[in-house]
Amino acid sequence: MNVEDIIEKVANGEIKLHQVEKYVNGDKRLATEIRRKALERKLGISLKHIGHYSIDPNELIGRNIENMIGVVQIPMGVAGPLKINGEYAKGEFYIPLATTEGALVASVNRGCSALTEAGGVVTTILDDKMTRAPLIRCPNARRAREVAEWVKENLNYLQEKAVAKVTRHGKLRDVKPFIVGNNLYLRFEFETGDAMGMNMVTIASEEIMKVIEEEFPDVRYLALSGNLCVDKKPNAVNFILGRGKTVVAEAIVPREIVEKKLKTTPELIAEVNYFKNLVGSAQAGSYGFNAHFGNIVGAIFLATGQDEAQITEGSHGITIAEVTPEGDLYISITMPSLEIGTVGGGTRVPTQREALSIMGVAGGGDPPGVNAKKFAEIVAGAVLAGELSLLAAIAAKHLARAHKMLGR
C-alpha cells in the first residue's frame, strides 16, 4: 500500500488515526504527514503552517503526543535582564515568554528593568514537594484512623518496600490523612528532584497502595487520585499546604524609581493592591489575590514545556505592596503551588529545552533538585516583575493606553 492509498483510507475512516504508524513501518514523521493530509482532505482545509516545524516526531510520539499532525507555533519574546538574589538563582536572567497577548512581554520587561535598577529580587523557597492522594474505602471511620496512624508511623518502611522499587529520585517524606466518613484520603508528599514529579509520585503511590492492602485486607484502594492531591483545579488545600514549590519573591523599590520609571507613587501602588488584589479578590471568592500571576506563569510554562494545566495552581497566590518607613515601596509575591520541573515531560522537546537553557536550567542539576529550585526562583522573580508593572500601570491609569498601543 502506497502513501496515497493510506491517506485515502485514513480520510474515509478505514484506517484509524492511531493505526497509521504500523502501515509505514513505524516512521512517525511520515505517519504525522499522512494524518495531517488525510485531515486536510476530509475537511477541505489547508494545514500548511501546522505542518511546518523542525522538531522530530520520532522523539515525541509515544512520549509527549499521540495522533500527531504537526505543531502549533506560539510567538516567544524575552524579558530582562532581571537581577535575582536567590538561594539558587544568583545573577541576571532573561525570561522566555510564549504568548499571543500584546503588551505582556513589554510589561514584564518594564518590571524587570525597575527591579534590577532597585538592586534585584530576593527569592526564598519555603517548601518543595509533590503530592498524590489515593482514596481508600474502609469499613468505618475508626478503621480509617487506624490505617492512617499506621501509615504515618511507617513512612520509612513504605519508602523501602514500595517507593524505592519504582524510582531512584523520589522520596516519600510525609503524609497528611483526611477522613470523611469511612473514606481515607492519604495525601502523600514526595521529594522529586528536578522533575515536576507527577508521573513519579503516581507510580510510587500505586506501589504504596499494594503494601497497604496487604497489611489491611479489609480495606479497598478505590482511586489512585482522590482529588485531595490537588492537581489542575482551583482548590484551597494547595493554597494552604502548598504543592510543588512554595516560593516568595520580594523587593524594595526606591520612591525615585517608582516615580520616574513607573510613573506613579508607592502609596498609589499599595492602595491599588489592597483594594484590587486583596479586597476585590476576597469579594470574588478568588484564590488569586494578585493582578495576573497566571499571565507570566502561563507564558513561561508554554515556553519551557511545563504542564500547561498546572497554570491553574500557578495563578494562586498573594501580592503584598506597602510603603516602607523611608517612603519606598516594598512589594512581594507568594506562590504556594508552583509545579515545575527541568527534566521529563515537555522539557524534552527541543524548543522548550532551548528556552530552559536561556535561563541556565535545562536538564538535571547537581545535586538533583537544584535546577528546578533555581527555575522556581526565576519564575517567581518574573511574576513579581509582572505584578509590579501592572499595578503601576493601573495606578497611573495607563492600562488601557498600553493595550491600545500594543495589544491590538
Swiss-Prot record:
Sorted alphabetically, the Gene Ontology BP terms of this entry are: coenzyme A metabolic process; isoprenoid biosynthetic process; sterol biosynthetic process
Tell me if NADP is a UniProt keyword of this record. yes
Assigned keywords, A-Z: Isoprene biosynthesis, NADP, Oxidoreductase
Q: Which residues form the active site?
A: 101, 307, 403
Q: Reaction catalysed by this chain?
A: (R)-mevalonate + 2 NADP(+) + CoA = (3S)-3-hydroxy-3-methylglutaryl-CoA + 2 NADPH + 2 H(+)
Q: What sort of enzyme, by top EC class, is this? A: oxidoreductase
UniProt GO MF annotations: hydroxymethylglutaryl-CoA reductase (NADPH) activity
EC number(s) on file: 1.1.1.34
PROSITE patterns on file: HMG_COA_REDUCTASE_1 (PS00066), HMG_COA_REDUCTASE_2 (PS00318), HMG_COA_REDUCTASE_4 (PS50065)
* Pathway membership, UniProt: Metabolic intermediate biosynthesis; (R)-mevalonate biosynthesis; (R)-mevalonate from acetyl-CoA: step 3/3
Q: Does the keyword Ligase apply?
A: no
- Record PANTHER family: 3-HYDROXY-3-METHYLGLUTARYL-COENZYME A REDUCTASE
Function of the protein: Converts HMG-CoA to mevalonate.
What family does the entry list?
A: Belongs to the HMG-CoA reductase family.
NCBIfam families reported in the protein's UniProt record: HMG_CoA_R_NADP
Protein name (record): 3-hydroxy-3-methylglutaryl-coenzyme A reductase
